[in-house]
From Swiss-Prot:
GO terms for molecular function: acetyl-CoA carboxylase activity; ATP binding; carboxyl- or carbamoyltransferase activity. Acetyl-CoA carboxylase is a heterohexamer composed of biotin carboxyl carrier protein (AccB), biotin carboxylase (AccC) and two subunits each of ACCase subunit alpha (AccA) and ACCase subunit beta (AccD). Belongs to the AccA family. This is Acetyl-coenzyme A carboxylase carboxyl transferase subunit alpha.
Length: 318
């Protein structure tokens, strides 16, 4: 099957066998119902075993799955009256980041997120979800607007990273990311950041300075891709699987390290298996987080955000 992952092969082979037996059972005089039921029970156990023992590399593949739900997919199910806003008022409109105003269960909010494409044409239009500086500046414009009008900010993170092209550098890519971090640190409204797929380096951080940060169960968050890390460390990108295990990039790793505030469960096999069910899990998390953060004063929100990031990391003195 297209877009299926290597670690799922045993599941797919067994599913194919069950499908063949069911087809044969419909046209044959031989009753294979018992055999089919046994295989279906075996399939359930196999799925439980494989999906509960996924490696970091397995999860990385799920996070990159071409059918994985995007920011706009979730916006359509989670928010009402979404109105997309465009442009950074400086250079242009970057389709790799989408954002606008909406309501969440009656509460006015600003929603911003990276947006990957659904096919080749769309990916070219969206630059594969890798923003230029104008994308980050558009996001900051919307965040400042939210701060002015007292709207909570909800960010969806899903990018390989900021676009590393020449034009992006000429227009101040690093400054745009740094400016977002600087300005977000002093926002007087709640900021919730959710990694829904791949959280790649500075491109992810530019939407990631939240009061609370959550990750989907199979999402990843890292300073560099496993392929890039392997190429730098061992001069061999084919060792990406080894790098993924060493880098501690999974939702479980980051929660254990105290970088994120929670893990959002995924449907069996990954978010792409059931968009509606996955959106409901995100709905629960946003509801709980908003309820907690909206009880904070403006000063408490700024202080909590500052303290959260101050605690991240380790340093030594000589």
């Amino acid at each position: 099957m297209a877009n299926e992952m290597e670690f799922e092969k045993p599941i797919l082979e067994l599913k194919s066998k069950i499908a063949d037996l069911k087809e044969y059972n419909e046209t044959s005089d031989v009753d294979l119902t018992n055999e089919i039921e046994k295989l279906e029970k075996r399939l359930a156990k196999l799925e439980a075993s494989i999906y509960s023992n996924m490696t970091a590399w397995d999860k990385f593949q799920v996070a990159r799955h071409p059918e994985r739900p995007t920011t706009l997919d979730y916006i359509s199910l989670l928010f009402e009256d979404f109105m997309e806003l465009h442009g950074d008022r400086t250079f242009g409109d970057d389709a790799a980041i989408v954002g606008g105003i909406a309501t969440f269960k009656g509460t006015p909010v600003t929603v911003i997120g990276h947006q990957r494409g659904k096919d080749t044409k769309d990916n070219l239009h969206r630059n594969f979800g890798m923003p230029h500086p104008e994308g980050f500046r558009k996001a900051l414009r919307l965040m400042k607007q939210a701060d002015k009008f007292g709207r909570p900010i909800i960010c969806f993170i899903d990018t390989k990273g900021a676009y590393p092209g020449r034009a992006a550098e000429e227009r101040g890519q690093s400054e745009a990311i740094a400016r977002n971090l600087y300005e977000m640190s002093d926002m007087k409204v709640p900021i919730i950041s959710i990694v829904i797929g791949e959280g790649g380096s500075g491109g992810a951080l530019a939407l990631g300075l939240g009061n609370q940060i959550f990750m989907l169960e199979n999402a990843v968050f890292s300073v560099i891709s496993p392929e890039g890390a392997a190429a730098i460390l061992w001069k061999d990108a084919s060792l990406a699987k080894k790098a993924a295990e060493s880098m501690r990039i999974t939702a479980g790793d980051l929660y254990e390290l105290g970088i994120t505030d929670g893990i959002i469960p995924e449907v069996k096999g990954g978010a792409h298996r059931d968009l509606a069910a996955q959106a409901e899990e995100i709905n629960k998390t946003i509801t709980k987080s908003l309820h907690a953060l909206m009880a904070f004063s403006e000063e408490q929100l700024i202080e909590q955000r500052y303290d959260k990031f101050k605690k991240i990391g380790v340093y030594e003195t000589l």
